[in-house]
């Protein structure tokens, strides 16, 4: 945050919001799209007003249904684009969602999950550079930067008392970080 505050063209403001549970990308990304209803199946596939939203093309379609001048793009497409390409992609747009995936890419893999805080720092720096480029090349006046979900992180190895024992046969969804069941938990 301090680094962003040093940028005279930046007025950073940090606020928290309520997140959907479980705290996973598929639920969080869907929550940030315009919608009347979200539905989640037992495999954590999420639909927004009945439409799939599991990839960039689907999210773009959902945004365009609200306004044909809305668009969903990937961070990589924009960060590597020259000024002409940026204008082509963004000129005349109403709302632009830019998806950046570095934190998930590193945090979801056991070999690199201990790098998640470093990935967050790098993501902030990369997004700040992109915002600077867009401001310079396109005179884009306002940016809202969000995260699709937070993360629960424990630096130390989990102890047995940190774990919950549950019959996986009655779970509708299991994951290394959570499980979903229709059964009540025991205290």
What does each model-identified segment do?
Residues 1-187:
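Feature captures the catalytic ectodomains and active-site-proximal regions of enzymes
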